[in-house]
Amino acid sequence: MKKKILITGVTGFVGSHMADYILENFPNYQIYASKRYHLSRLDKIKHVYEKIKWVDCDITDPISSEKMIRFVNPNKIFHFAAESFVSPSWDHPHRYMSVNYNGTLNILEAMKKIKSNAKILIPGSGEEYGLLEKKDMPITEKTLINPVNPYAVSKVAQDYISYVYYKSFGVKAIRVRTFNHEGPRRENVFGISSYAYQIAKIEKSKSKNKNILVGHLKDKRNFTHVLDIVNAYWIATELCEVGKLYLIGNYNLKSIYTFQQALEKLKSLSKIKNLKHKIHTPFVRPTNVPFLITGKTEFEKLTGWKPKISFNQILSDTLNFWRSEV
């Protein structure tokens, strides 16, 4: 009999790649996935839709969440269902807390009730570290969090409640904070994916308007390909200690760039020359985070995991994805 994996948020960016990774590498597992009745968009997962067993669930509803956990009774849970775009969190803070915190709480409470022995991956965000200075880089497991947007606060709350359920009830929470990851299927509201999407549209339309709309360009991040990230997530559920916090990011100096540098590299990959860009006010955040860079982490020391895919390949893969979509 196959072991059972439950993926929440499988219709999204990371969740869909996680499903691909499991199907390609672990045929002894059956994937179960939650979807919000008729509301979930399935375009990112349509290529493997028939290989997944679907469960209707709204994770913000505790009764619905408990029914799902009881029905599936999984061996592993990858909990990706979340509101993840930072900018709208200032306008919709209740929504972010409802999905990211309450949704996680409902899953954990259901696991407690059925005495689940499953490991659950709780993916946090580098955004939780918030407003740090250049001298505070690289971020380590000992760096204090300083969240400065509602999204980051919701992820801190998600992480802390998972620790509470581990400590109080023995729920096997694998806690990770993941730094910037990009690649195909990333929604076109996020920096690099937004630039690539706009370039692909300009290429297709051959428009005279060659302006790419951008937000903050000076922010510096270390970037990891989503395929390296899902590999790290699987390894985390196999090797990481439950209850302990791990950071996942690409510490290689060749992975550290500003968004300005990423934009210029994408421009150089375009078939259209003389592309320009301009600041678009709605893309500018009320409070900005200039630096989010991790060094070599305890996760890498424990597992030996290292990202394999270069930053240039991240950009190429993202641009080619949008060329195939627009």
Task: Mark where each language-model region is.
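A recurrent short beta-strand within the Rossmann-like NAD(P)-dependent oxidoreductase core
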Residues: R177-H181, K210-H216, R221, Y233, ...
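N-terminal Rossmann-like NAD(P)+-binding domain of SDR-like oxidoreductases, especially those catalyzing
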Residues: M1-H181
